[in-house]
Amino acid sequence: MEEQFTNQKKVSHLQSLMNTKRSEQPTEFAKKHRFKDTLALFLVFLSFNHFTSLCLLVSFIVATKCKDFLANCFIILFLSKKPSRHIGEVAHIDISTSKVTNGSSNRKSNSRFFGNSKNSFVIPIPVLICEILFAMLLKIYGGDYFVKPIKNLAISIIASFLINDPSDCLSYATSCSVLYAVSTNTFQRVSHFFDIIQLFDMSLRGTGQSIKLFTVFRKYSQFFKKLFSLFLPMPFKMLGKHSDSMIYYLSFHILFFSFASSLLHPHRQTAENKPLKKGFNSTKPDVARVQGLQKMRISSSSSVSADSNTLEDQSPMIPNDPGGLSSSNQTIHPSQQNNSPVPLSSHSNILNPAASYPTDATSSFPYFTSMVKEYKSYQPSVISAEGSNSQAVTTTTSTTTSPTTFNFSGDNTSLSNEISLSDSSNGNSKKDSDFFSPSNDKYTNQLFELNVDFGNMFSSSKLSSDISVTSNLENFIRLLFRRKNQHLIAPLWSMVVTLKTTNFEKKYLQETSENSLTPTNSNTSYVSNQEKHDKDLDTINTHSVSSRISFTHAGKFKKSVFNNFEPSNTMALIAKTTSDDYNLLNLVSTNENIFNRNDNDYKVCIIDISTNSITFHIENLHDGELIVLVNGVIWSEVSCALILEHVGEEYVVVNGLVPSCSYDIQFINRLNHRDDYLVSDLIVRTCGNNNAIAGKFENLDFSFPSYYHRKFLSPLLTLKHSVLTTNANLSDERTKLKKTKKEFSKKLSLLRQEIDYFKGRISQNATHDEKSTLKVENLKVALQQSETAVNKLEMQLKTLTEKELELEEEYLKKKDLHLKNQLEFSKLEESLSKDLKNSEGRFQKVNQELVQLGSKLDKLNARNEKLQKEVDQNAEEIEKFSTQFLSKREKDRFRRKEYRIREANKFELTIKGLEQDINRLENENENIHSLIGNSY
C-alpha cells in the first residue's frame, strides 16, 4: 500500500511538472522571438504608403486613448447589452468624500477602469501647445536629422506595443529603430564603395516602384482613399500634400506621450509585472489564500454552538469569535438614504482577509430607501468548514482535478472577482497544505434586521440597480484593454482574441444545436429541437442520456470555452458536479437575451420557512409539469395547491428537509414532456429546532455562507444530512417504541378483561335476539315506504327543475332586455351629460361676457359723469371768459375810435396844408412858365 501511495505521488508530481512545462512552453517561445517579431512587424509598417501609415498612427492613438470606449463596444457586441454603469451611480457612493485608506487605490483603479470615457481622450491645452511648438522647432531647425528618426521610432513603438508587454515596449522599440538606422547607414556607405544597388532608397512609399510583397497594401490603400474621399470635406489632393507633416506630428505625439508616461510613472508597469521574491516561493500568499478557499470548497458544516460564538457590532473581522452573534453591542441605526453607501474595498477584504481593516461606520452599510425605518447590522466572521464542523465530507468522489470558480460579489456592488481553484491530488494535498498554511481563513458576512414601513411602498423611489450576472465577463473584457497589467498577449491583440472567442462559441452553438440532447440557450435552437423531437419523453432516462452525451458527442461538448471540465484547458465559469439530475435535463432558454425580462415570465416568492419544509408561491405557471430539484436531486416530498382565484398561480410546499441546513432548490417547468425551462434557482436555509435567539438573530452556521458554497450543495451532502437526521430520528423512535410497547401491553390486558365481560353479557341476553329480529322486519317495511316516498319526491324534483329551467330562460331574456335598456340609457345619459356640459360651458361663457360688459358699462358711466363735469366747468369758464373778452373788446374799440378820430383830424390838417402848398406851387409854376414864355 505504501509503495502504491508513493507511486501515485510520483505520478501526480510528474503530471503537475508536465502540465507546468506545457503551460510555460508558449510563453517562453513568445518571449524568445519577441524581438524578431517586432523587427519584422516594424519593417512591414515601414513599407506602408502615406495614407496607410497615417491610418495606422491615427488608429493607434485612438486605441490607446479610448480604451473604455473600445471595451464598451466589445461588451455590446459580445454580451448584447449595455455596459454596466459606475458603481457610484448604482449604489449611491460618493467616491470623492470617502476616506477609507484601505480601498483608496481600489477606488482609483475602479474609477479609471469603469469611469466615463468622455475625458479619456482629452489632452490639456497647454501640453498640446507645448508639444506642437517643440515639434515645429525640431522640424524647422533640425530638418531630416529629427523628422525621419522620430517617424521610425513612432512606428517601432506601434510594432512593439502590438507584440510586447507595456513595460518592455520602449526598450524593444528603441532597439529596433536603432538597429534599422545603423543598418541603413552602413549599407549606404558600403554601397558607394562596392557599387551595390541601394535597395533602401527605393520608393516604398508614394507612387514609385514598390516591392511585390507589398502590392496588396497599395490596393487596399487605393480602395480606402476612394472611400474616405466620399466623407472628407476637403479634396484628397490637399490631404496628400500635408500627409508628411501630419504623419510627423502624429508620430511626435506618440513619441512624446509614451516617453512622458514612462518617465512620470517609471515603476508603474515593472512593479506589477515582476514576481515577488519573498521566501522560497513567490506565490506563497496566493497559494495560502487558495488553500484556505479549497478547505471551504471541499467541506460543509452542520451547526455552530451559540455559547462559544460572539459578534462585535460594526467590525468586519473578529479573530477570536469566528461565527456567532453577541447581543450586547447591537445599536439601532435610523435609515438614511444619503449616509449609507457600500465601500468599494469590500472585495479586497473578502479576497484577502489578512489585509482587511475596520472601515468607517458610515461606509459599511448598504443603501436603503425610505421604506426602511430602522435597521440593525451584524457582521459575523466566517471560518472554513473544517474548523467549525467535524462532520465535513467532500462532495467530489473522483480523484481527478476539477476547476471551481468562486464569484465573490457584494450586495450592492457590480465588481465580482473570480478565483479559479483546483483540487489537489492524493499525495500532494498534504504537502501543499503543510508548506503553504493559510495565515487567516476568516471572512465576514453582513446580516441586517430591517424595520419596514409598508405605507411608504408606493411613494418610495425605485433603486436604479444595474448589477447583472455578466459582471465577470465585463471585467474580463475591460481588463484586456488595461495597459498597466501584464498579459500573455498584447492589449491591442486582445480585440482579435475576443472576436475569435465569440466566433468559436457561435460555431460551437451551431454544432450543438443540431443535437437534440444538447442544452440550448436561444429560441432558434428551441424551434429546431421542437422539429426534431417527434416523440414525447415522459421521464428522464438517466442512463441513455448520460451515455449518449459521454460517448457520441463527447468531442463537441469539450470544445466550448465556457463548458470544458478538463483541468488543463478549462475556462469554466460555473462548477457543477456530474452526478446531479440537473445535468440530465433538457434545458431550454426562455429568451434569446437574458436581460429582456417580461411580466409574463416565471415568478417565485418564498412564503414560509420552517424546520422541515419551505412554502413557495409560483406565478405564470400555466402548462406542463413542475419538477422540483433539491441539491441537484429530483425531490419527491413535494405538494402543490392551485390558486383558483388566479390562473397560473399555485403554492408549492417542499417537505422532508433538515433543520438549520442550506438547500439549493430549483424549479423546472417541463412542456410537451421534453423541453425543460428553469423557473428559479434559490438557496434557502431552514430554521432550527431550538428557539434560542441571540440578539433577535438565529445562531446560524456561518461556515456555510450564502452563494459562496453553491458547489457544496450536492446530492452526496443531501444524502449525508438525511442519513444523520434519520439516525437521530431512529433513536428517538426506538425510545418511543419501548414506551408504547409497555402501554400497549397494559391496554391489551384491559381489553381482554372487557372481552370476557361482554361475552358473559351476550350469553345472558340471548332472549333479546327475537325482539331484535322483529325490529329488523319493521324497519324493512318502513324502508320500503320511505323508498316510495323518495320516488315521489324525485318526480316532483324533476318537474321543479324543468320549471326552474324555464324560469331561468325567461330571466335571461329579461336580463338581456334590461341590459339593452341599460346600454341605451347609458348612451342617452352620456349624450345628455355631454350636452349639459356643453350648455353649462356656454352658459358660463355668456355669464362671463355679461359680467365683462356690465363692468365695461359701469366704467363708461363713470367716465361719462367725469366728462360731463368737465364740460360744465368748461362752459362756466367759457362764459366768464366771453364776458371779460367782450368788455375788453369794447374798451379796445372805443380807444381805437378815439385814436382814429385823432388821426383823421391830423390827416385833415395835413391835407389842408398840402393843398395850400400845392396851390402855392402851381401858382409859382405858372409864374415861371409865364416868365419863360416871355423870354423866348
From Swiss-Prot:
One of its GO terms (cellular component) is endoplasmic reticulum. Keywords: Endoplasmic reticulum, Isopeptide bond, Membrane, Transmembrane, Transmembrane helix, Ubl conjugation. The chain crosses the membrane at residues 42-62, 121-141, 246-266. Residues 299-308, 394-405, 414-428 have a biased composition (Low complexity). Residues 325-351, 512-529 have a biased composition (Polar residues). It is found in: Endoplasmic reticulum membrane. Residues 63-120, 267-936 are cytoplasmic. There is a cross-link at K10 (Glycyl lysine isopeptide (Lys-Gly) (interchain with G-Cter in ubiquitin)). Residues 1-41, 142-245 are lumenal. It is a multi-pass membrane protein. The keyword Aminoacyl-tRNA synthetase does not apply. Residues 297-351, 387-437, 512-533 are annotated as: Disordered. Present with 996 molecules/cell in log phase SD medium. This is Protein NNF2. It comes from Saccharomyces cerevisiae (strain ATCC 204508 / S288c).
